[in-house]
């Protein structure tokens, strides 16, 4: 049991694990609340505070509470169950062509239905492999070979880039006869992003197929152009699953060869999932409103909706409601505390705050400004309550894991504050080594691990040591964030981000630095592609959550800072996933 691995610090008291709804034993405990008072104003020197001028939230409490999907998850449950059985029969139909089955599986995944058919999909892929894999497919079909390669690799089967050699010439370039094969090129392009380190053929295919797709985009019919543009914007394996499902339902609806049963199930399932998301969001909106930080901390971002959107990217499936709620609390607190470090606190105050988090000691913040006390106590009470629930439900003592993650995050925030205050530009390597921690992906994933409820001794040890499964998604998170926010950060006086550090160290232009950052993002994704096939101590739900930590910033930072300064694109994404249901008129 992990509890034996750690020395329990003297800050640990009964209060840490007492639920607010359970009577407290009659012992002498310090009362912890968010009513801490700072010194009287005339005793505290006036400090000029910065302002980031973050725009207010557009998603008001009253608006969120007014959302109503009419309990779609209950209303359509029986109809969806019958459709699900029909689709299951299609997957398990051994008399149909294997390519048809693979295309069905691909459609199921893109429509956000894979979690309903996990065993059936595995059974179908096992059957495909036992039959000879790609050797039972049409050998001259680039689409068939590429699709099978992508699906098998994503599901952890051994496949090799040599499967594509029949389509390449002696120079390693695509044979001319395939260069006008739109479906084949699209499938090969998507498959190439599932490459592992050392797979040069696939690495080269990324660039080559992109050139062909750009050419095809200029000379193809309108219905094909939409699919090509979508793929070129971001490859499928890097997209948020539910956001892709929303887009693909509309695209699939336009296809002449669409399967009516599958399409109807996808629409019902989306609306049912959305109904659950709305209830989760309402719960979190009440929590955030009662916490009161948005009203008390005028300098900080009020981003409850954006934080909840994050959690949909992490785990959208209905069974992960508790996980979404927990992660909404975590990401909301990360946003607040990030602003304490970036905008509000003096360096001396931040040193004290960091020490308090590391010691997990409420007494350590008593001399800090009121808003910093509120921030710490909100963190302290929320995380202790989450730890209490985990101990109660799972019997797992997780305070050491959670507090270490928060302490390491605050240390990384503090390092960035030191660079900013001293106008220091660190080396690129030093920045990235600190930056993947300050991105907060590791904190989110440590909490997600326990919220998903699959614990093992070896995995717990890996959490403490920040296994690569936490590191590489966090690298993508950091670099995507920097690509979107570097200009605003420099305007606030922050000197260190990956772009400025790379420019300064290598004496290159901003354009060249951005190009290099994108290459590093690709490299990180190549590392992550190993998660599905490499032996790890983590279960598939957590592996998928880790990859999702990298998918989300690829979405929200694609065209700007959708977290700090949400724009119309951000609003449209929220609207399409959480607010606007899919019309069932055609169903």
Curated annotation (Swiss-Prot):
Transmembrane segments: none annotated. Binds 3 Mg(2+) ions per subunit. Keywords: Lyase, Magnesium, Metal-binding. InterPro entries: Isoprenoid_synthase_dom_sf, Terpene_cyclase-like_1_C, Terpene_cyclase_plant_C1, Terpene_synth_N, Terpene_synth_N_sf, Terpene_synthase-like, Terpene_synthase_metal-bd, Terpenoid_cyclase/PrenylTrfase. Its cofactor is Mg(2+). One of its GO terms (molecular function) is terpene synthase activity. Pfam families: Terpene_synth, Terpene_synth_C. Its EC number is 4.2.3.-. Mg(2+) 1 binds at residues 338, 342. The Asp-Asp-Xaa-Xaa-Asp/Glu (DDXXD/E) motif is important for the catalytic activity, presumably through binding to Mg(2+). Belongs to the terpene synthase family. Does not produce any detectable product when tested in vitro. This is Probable terpene synthase 12. The gene is TPS12.
